[in-house]
Amino acid sequence: MLQPKRTKFRKVMTGRNRGLAKGTEVSFGDFGLKAVGRGRLTARQIEAARRAMTRHIKRQGQIWIRVFPDKPITEKPLEVRQGKGKGNVEYWVAQIQPGKVMYEMNGVPEELAREAFRLAARKLPIKTTFVTKQVM
């Protein structure tokens, strides 16, 4: 599972997920999976989508993961009263804004890439679209 090796602070405030994304162009591969909506991806969801793509393309080509879960999410245990401080870190998330290219792929035909991204998108809680590299 993806998570930072070390962080400056153990817990962070919830905050808001506003604004526009950086990394909106396909820059490493030929095809990409771009977010249309906004939300959060957990490390497990990122890994599940990666596995779905890798299995479909049968380890040919190359895949880039352009998102990293760097925000800790805390939860209090079940049946614990409120108060007594903030809960423990349970999992890590990546915050996604519209337009962010989350995965990239090359070395495979477009139809195979399209189907692999469709399978990966089923694992994600965000609406996505298939994009190709713009050649100028």
Swiss-Prot record:
> What UniProt keywords apply to this chain's record, in alphabetical order?
Ribonucleoprotein, Ribosomal protein, RNA-binding, rRNA-binding, tRNA-binding
Name its GO BP terms in alphabetical order: translation
Taxonomically, the superkingdom here is: Bacteria
What are the disulfide bonds?
Answer: none
Keyword hit for rRNA-binding: yes
Annotated InterPro entries: Ribosomal_uL16 (IPR047873), Ribosomal_uL16_bact-type (IPR000114), Ribosomal_uL16_CS (IPR020798), Ribosomal_uL16_dom (IPR016180), Ribosomal_uL16_sf (IPR036920)
Which Pfam families does this one have?
A: Ribosomal_L16
On subunit structure and binding partners, the annotation says: Part of the 50S ribosomal subunit.
* Family assignment from sequence similarity: Belongs to the universal ribosomal protein uL16 family.
Question: What is the annotated role of this protein in its UniProt record?
Answer: Binds 23S rRNA and is also seen to make contacts with the A and possibly P site tRNAs.
The protein's name in its UniProt record: Large ribosomal subunit protein uL16
